[in-house]
Amino acid sequence: MKFSQAVQDFERYLLLDMNRSANTIQSYRRDLAKFQAYLTEQGIDNVEAIDELTVRAFLAKLSQASYAASSTSRMLSSLKQFFLFLRKEGILETNPMSLVHRPKQGRHLPKVLTAREIEALLQAPDTSSPHGLRDRAIFELMYATGLRVTELVQLKLEDLHLELGFIQTLGKGDKERLVPLIDEAIEWLEAYLEQVRPSFLRLAGSPSPQEVFLTERGKAFTRQGIWKNLNKYVALAGIKQNVSPHMLRHSFATHLLENGADLRMVQELLGHADISTTQIYTHISTQRLQEVYRKYFPRA
C-alpha cells in the first residue's frame, strides 16, 4: 500500500472510529508528513518496505538535527499508533516499531511569570480601544483559568456560563472540563461581549462565527494571533524574558500551588490526565522557595 493512502486511511480511522479531535489528527498528520519526506529521500513509497532499520535511521536523523527529546517522543508516539493501526488492519504482517522505544527525557522546569509581571501584562492593553478591551479580556481569561491557547481560540459562546461563574472547555483527548472564573475575569469578558464583539461581528460572513474571540473582521481568532498580540504587550509591559501563551498556564498553576492550593484540584483545573504532569509545578514552587530563602535568610 502507498504510504499516502495508508495515512488517509489512518486519519479516517482516527476521526470515525476513535473520535479524535481535528487538532489531534493534524498533529499526527504533521509527524507523518515529516516521516514521509524522509521515506521519499530514501526512495521508499510503500509501507511494506518500511522496517525497523528505516525507523531507527529516521530517528537518528532527527537527533542529528538537534530535535528535542520531547518532540522525538511525540513523533515516536505518532509512528507507534500509525503502525499499530496498519498491523491491526492486516496491512502489515510485522510492526517495525515493536522494538523501538522512547528516548529518556530530562526534566525541564516550565518558565513562569511573577505576580508583578502578570499584573503589568494585564495592564498593558489600552482598554479604551476595542482591540485593547478584547485583548485584556483574553489575557484575563487565560491567566484566570489556565486555558491552553488552542482551548481559548476554540471557546464558543455556548461554553460560557458567566452567570454561574464558570466556563466549559474541551481539552486534550477531547476531555471536557469545567473551570471556575473569578469576578474580575467575568467583568472583562462581559465588557468585551457587550461593547466589542457585536461591532466585530458586523463584518462576519454567514453563518455567524460562534467563537468567543474575534478579529476586527469578524473571523475567529487564531493561535498565531494570540502569540503576536502577546509579544506586543510583553514589550509594552517591560517584561524582559520571552513569553509564550503557555507561560500564562504555567503561571496560573504555579501561583495556585504557591498560595496553598491542593495538587489534585490544580490537576482538575488544568485537565491533566496524570497527576505526575501536574507535579512539575511543585518543583517550580520548591525552587522559588529556595531562592527566597537564600536571598532573605541572614545565614544563607
Locate predicted features.
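Conserved catalytic core of the tyrosine transesterase superfamily
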Residues: 1-300
